[in-house]
């Protein structure tokens, strides 16, 4: 689904799961940071002259405007993915958060959390209709902080970005839940 546009510092521009992935060729890349993760099947991602095999659970965050292409790779014709693109006032500064240039690969051993996050957000939107723009924005910071944590080794709640952005936002949301 495509969440509503907002004035938040960070939000999801598009998000999806259980997506039967068609071949994609982007000679000029994509204009936003783009997460893609294999749910089922196997994909082949080509970027910067490198081929990355995306097995179930593997995911990758691709920086904006990085030429890339991806397609199903295991011969089944059935490559299912989840995806997330980021937008908002801080979207151009995500390289500072994730230190991604031009991509960050996440192996299946670390990927389950990201899949569960996407499933949870989609479930909250479609089945419960209980996610608002503020909650989605906080969730996007959480998602990116978790990615950044893979590079730094800090726990999620110790990460400086969590302390600076997520904790205050969560406190603000919690203080207004009864409103």
Predicted region positions:
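A short, N-terminal "cap"/entry segment at the start of jelly-roll beta-barrel domains
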Residues: 1-11, 105, 124-127, 131, ...
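N-terminal positioning helix adjacent to the helix-turn-helix/winged-helix DNA-binding module
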Residues: 110-113, 161-169
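N-terminal regulatory/effector-sensing and dimerization cores
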Residues: 7-101, 133
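Aromatic/histidine-rich interaction motifs
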Residues: 96-119
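Polybasic "coupling" helices that flank or enter modular domains
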Residues: 138-141, 156-164
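Basic, amphipathic alpha-helical hairpins
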Residues: 120-131, 144-156, 168-179
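Short, solvent-exposed positions on alpha-helices
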Residues: 130-138
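Amphipathic, well-ordered alpha-helical segments in soluble domains
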Residues: 11, 34-37, 90, 113-117, ...
């Amino acid at each position: 689904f495509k969440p509503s546009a907002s004035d938040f510092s960070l939000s999801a521009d598009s998000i999806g799961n259980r997506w039967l992935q068609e071949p994609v060729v982007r000679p000029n890349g994509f204009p936003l940071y783009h997460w893609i993760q294999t749910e089922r099947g196997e994909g082949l991602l080509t970027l910067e002259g490198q081929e990355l095999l995306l097995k179930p659970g593997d995911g990758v965050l691709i920086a904006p405007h990085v030429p890339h292409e991806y397609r199903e790779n295991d011969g089944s014709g059935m490559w299912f993915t989840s995806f997330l693109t980021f937008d908002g006032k801080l979207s151009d500064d995500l390289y500072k958060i994730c230190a991604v240039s031009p991509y960050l690969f996440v192996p299946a051993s670390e990927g389950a959390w990201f899949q569960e996050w996407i499933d949870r957000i989609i479930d909250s939107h479609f089945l419960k209709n209980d996610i608002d723009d503020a909650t989605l924005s906080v969730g996007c910071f959480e998602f990116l902080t978790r990615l950044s944590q893979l590079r730094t080794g800090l726990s999620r709640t110790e990460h400086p970005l969590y302390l600076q952005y997520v904790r205050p936002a969560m406190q603000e949301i919690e203080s207004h839940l009864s409103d």
